[in-house]
């Protein structure tokens, strides 16, 4: 039996190991957005498939029996491609979904529709912690008054805020370390994507 795991997450690496231990032949596919990704066990391919038709062709050419979508919750394109390709080929698809984080008492969450709106809302604060990845930072570049602490696995793309501190680091991060980072930088706002997961 052969499985294709659409991955790049901790859950996808854990699943690759479990399937390999159960006797499956596993290929994990990574988008290629991180320069030095954590690689799962088994075969690994990096890069796109060429949309749903390319993925469907790859699935048939490699005689895949099961596709598992274990991508990041905001990786919408590949999830759509996987759904269309498996529907076209009749190959079963399992999608792993992390439970979203939920606010606790005294949390002050502000929901926004996009990064442009997030940038407008962030300007009312003074020390903003950005954990949104390296590709969506441009909307924050126009704010020259506030300090932005930006954490990313790889160096960011595009313009950055005039006042910023860049932290190149890869998680997972402990709650204790996150609290210390926020205290050390006097963070009064966090901009993040609700990608869920355990705390």
Whereabouts are the PLM-identified features?
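N-terminal basic/disordered segments at the start of proteins
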Residues: 3-32
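N-terminal beta-loop-helix "entrance" segment that forms/cooperates
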Residues: 27-50, 105-108, 159-165
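Short, polar loop motifs at secondary-structure junctions
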Residues: 28-36, 96-102, 115, 134-136, ...
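Glycine-rich, highly charged phosphate/nucleotide-binding loops
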Residues: 42-59, 167-177
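Glycine/small-residue-rich loop that forms an oxyanion/phosphate-binding "nest" at active or ligand-binding sites
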Residues: 55-115
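Internal active-site segments that recognize and position negatively charged phosphoryl groups
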Residues: 115-149
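Histidine/lysine/aspartate-rich catalytic loop segments that bind and position anionic ligands
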Residues: 139-171
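A C-terminal functional module that forms or caps the active site or interfaces directly
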Residues: 158-199
